[in-house]
Amino acid sequence: MTKQASRFKLGRNSTSLALVFGILAAAGSAVAQSPDYKSPSPAFTEALAAFDAAWAADGLAFSAVTFTDGPGSGYGKYTATENNVFSAGETIALYAEPVGYAFDQSQDGYTYKLAASYRLMNTSGQVLSEQSDFAEFTGTTRSKQRQLSASLSFQFDGLPEGDYALEATFADQIGNQTAGFKLPFTIQAAN
């Protein structure tokens, strides 16, 4: 009898201890889910909302476009060329910062999706080479990704000396809008 009574007593104590630990764990969990940090001021929050509205209203555009010495390594991380003159057979790199593209919101976050096309033209506007949707810039992030950089590289073998233009068009596949730019350049004989 004594053995059973002590088992029962131990079981009751175990249940009480489990209940106490469960309450403490729940309280700790509530604290862990509510981080303590300084929130932005109302002025900052209002400015961010105004920026968001301007971003959506302006539509797809570019805040930077330039030829570069090799591919960029991230947003704002590029070295612009000193001029737009390239040697025959040299890789031509460019950097662009698209803005105003749309986002698709889901439980995973905010998705953006852009596709780039290009056309190589001579000075009379004749298209020498072109390709649609040859590069894609896409991602999903918890916050709206507004610092998107696009590095594109081109190799035009056999292009004779002369003046040309490289036209790039970006298609916002979520916002159903397009924007582009045209960069003139010169090919000179290789040294």
Give the residues covered by each predicted segment.
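Intrinsically disordered, low-complexity terminal regions enriched in Ser/Thr/Pro/Gly
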Residues: Q33-N191
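Sec/Tat signal peptide C-region and signal peptidase I cleavage site
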Residues: G28-A32
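N-terminal secretory signal peptides that target proteins for export/translocation
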Residues: M1-R12
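An N-terminal domain-start capping segment
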Residues: G11-S16, K77-Y78
